[in-house]
Swiss-Prot record:
One of its GO terms (molecular function) is ATP binding. Keywords: ATP-binding, Cytoplasm, DNA replication, DNA-binding, Lipid-binding, Nucleotide-binding. Residues 73-113 are annotated as: Domain II. This is Chromosomal replication initiator protein DnaA. It comes from Alkaliphilus oremlandii (strain OhILAs).
Amino acid sequence: MQDNLPQIWEKTLNLIKPELTEVSFTTWIKSIEVISLEGNTMILGVPNVFTKDILTARYATLISNALKQTTSKNFEIRFIVPSEEKISKTEESQKKLEGSVNISVASDQFVSNNLNPKYTFDTFVIGNSNRFAHAASLAVAESPAKAYNPLFLYGGVGLGKTHLMHAIGHFILQNNPKAKVVYVSSETFTNELINSIRHDRNVEFRNRFRTIDVLLVDDIQFIAGKESTQEEFFHTFNALHESNKQIIISSDRPPKEIPTLEDRLRSRFEWGLITDIQPPDLETRIAILYKKAQMENIDVPNEVLTHIAKKIQSNIRELEGALIRIVAYSSLTNSEITVELASEALKELFSSKARQLNIDLIKEVVANKYNMKIEDFNSKKRTRSISYPRQIAMYLSRELTDLSLPKIGEEFGGRDHTTVMHAHEKISKDILADDNIKEKIERIAKEIKGD
């Protein structure tokens, strides 16, 4: 029977298809891959954990019954995510290895394995908001260390910075499979540094990051205020740059606006090309949704894609999340995808966004916390009871909105952008130095966001 599994599965699919809507069949069933037959258990591969959970909860019985009709036998169904199975086996092997030898930070299995296979240049949707960043990324991928070094990408959350970084890594590896490409978040870099210090393996750590061809570091802003991490990254940067190796960095803001970042790092980040990514316009948002639906092999009416794109303007992650939510809702209710269904599926999402997060709201919440008048934020008063809450409000405006420094300055009585930058840097330092201040500002931020 093992040899006949493809034919058996084909017949099973033909029995299942009439029982479901086209959307449900395409979304959940079509992506299933027959892996093997182990006794009376059919092993079926699925693309991700979310799909696995849905299939287990809603469709396992349907599939089992269809298999019984096809083969006249009872089968247990087990869904697996093949990529996760491989990872768990690798981790198990690594644990066994670590049990018999000293743990080493260095590895020939470079972090290129961490590159998301979906994040390539082919799947990146180009629009006016990201055209220059895309062109710069492609130039770097085509000629590592010759075009722009470093390449510094910045922009808000979920706008495509990580996608472009992964795409660069994939492109380089495709053209040179032997290239040593490391993709790492700044948090991971910090954690690995801490572990290397704890276990006295600094040499291995440095070898890992300084003997490579391409280093991609995501969310570099999180090393701000971490002296040891900045020190190590400074020397790593120098070693790679002097060896003519490519460095790509991403952040949520340009180098000059990252608080408590050492000047020597700031200047090095500015050696190459700095390019930003802005929120996508309506046409680009529709194109992104169309591309996502195409990749997932889902048929979604154009009017629904337009409806989503008009409602969600913030970032790509939320756009794609809304599309997945609508498809899941359609499948779970066994209904066709329409604008009405989309509105119903997303009503909770939209209602939670009803309270507009803007500077007026930030001023209102901060003013209530510090017993001050709203107009005091725009006044010239410099007493600490006024100036410090004003700095907190400026800090939160920078952290919680996408407004530029000059625009924030305008909202606070026409102040210069350097005043906003100073306020942000001061509060950032206070947060690092004083846990009470950190907790208080976190509480204010949660209240502003409605958490």
